[in-house]
């Protein structure tokens, strides 16, 4: 990628962040766990080539009220006919038994997701392109349609902020969600590869990237949610549940982190 292209991409990302920063809205943050990897050709439109969803999680956050309106987390029933490789189970921990006993029909999950999506002006995800494609392929399999509003990918927007070296030697690699969270807050959340946890973590990262504000400091509701789902015991003592949020150590803001890395 040449210098002009990099500058144009950075300017576009800055414009997107500024647009999100000044606009108050309801946003949907979502994540999926799947039966496997996407096809090598990400533009493939054949649903048979795409993995199935085994867990779908999303939340609706009102930036006007600074409040979570809905938090949904469902396991999907794969039946006995959809392959569920052991290597995928090793990542997300959802076995065939869990899927059969706790899962719901994918059509119900998609309908609820679609209705929730209509309430929102923006959707947010980490590696958004993958999650939207997986959802669209599931919708296509079930003769449904999904339309996503304006979107924000925390992975792509934060690439130049995290500055993680590419294994291929050119530019920076896309940061994983835990890498981004560690970069912003100097801690690694627990229970990764659970789409509910990843959704909560993504919201915290998004809010810091766009609003320069840590929700664990500014929102008692979110702080309790994050404390109960995403922290280890020693971090819970630091976060507290009913203590003074102003006593928490402030993480560096993204602008400060950028200056340190430059």
Language model regions located:
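Short alpha-helix plus adjacent loop in nuclease-associated cores
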Residues: 152-172
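Acidic two-metal-ion nuclease catalytic site recognized across multiple nuclease folds
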Residues: 2-6, 17-22, 183, 196, ...
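Short hydrophobic/aromatic-enriched beta-strand-loop microsegments
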Residues: 145-152
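Conserved non-catalytic scaffold segment of RNase H-like nuclease domains
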Residues: 2-6, 18-142, 171, 175-185, ...
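Ser/Thr-centric signal marking residues that sit
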Residues: 32-35, 154, 202
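Intrinsic-disorder/low-complexity detector
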Residues: 9-15
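Active-site catalytic microenvironments for nucleophilic, acid-base chemistry
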Residues: 138-142, 160, 164, 183, ...
């Amino acid at each position: 990628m040449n210098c002009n292209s990099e500058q144009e991409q950075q300017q576009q990302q800055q414009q997107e962040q500024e647009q999100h920063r000044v606009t108050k809205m309801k946003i949907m943050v979502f994540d999926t766990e799947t039966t496997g990897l996407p096809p090598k050709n990400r533009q493939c439109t054949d649903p048979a080539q795409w993995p199935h969803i085994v867990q779908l999680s999303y939340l609706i956050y009102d930036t006007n009220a600074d409040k979570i309106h809905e938090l949904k987390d469902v396991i999907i029933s794969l039946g006995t006919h959809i392959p569920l490789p052991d290597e995928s189970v090793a990542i997300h921990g959802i076995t065939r038994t869990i899927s059969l006993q706790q899962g719901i029909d994918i059509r119900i999950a998609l309908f609820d997701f679609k209705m929730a999506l209509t309430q929102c002006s923006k959707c947010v995800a980490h590696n958004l392109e993958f999650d939207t494609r997986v959802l669209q392929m599931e919708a296509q399999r079930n003769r449904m349609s999904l339309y996503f509003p304006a979107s924000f990918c925390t992975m792509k927007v934060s690439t130049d902020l995290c500055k993680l070296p590419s294994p291929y030697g050119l530019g920076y690699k896309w940061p994983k969600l835990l890498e981004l969270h560690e970069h912003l807050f100097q801690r690694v959340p627990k229970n990764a590869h659970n789409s509910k946890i990843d959704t909560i973590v993504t919201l915290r990262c998004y809010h810091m990237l766009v609003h320069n504000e840590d929700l664990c400091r500014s929102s008692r509701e979110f702080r309790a949610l994050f404390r109960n789902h995403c922290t280890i015991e020693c971090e819970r003592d630091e976060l507290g549940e009913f203590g003074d949020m102003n006593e928490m150590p402030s993480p560096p803001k993204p602008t400060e982190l950028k200056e340190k890395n430059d």
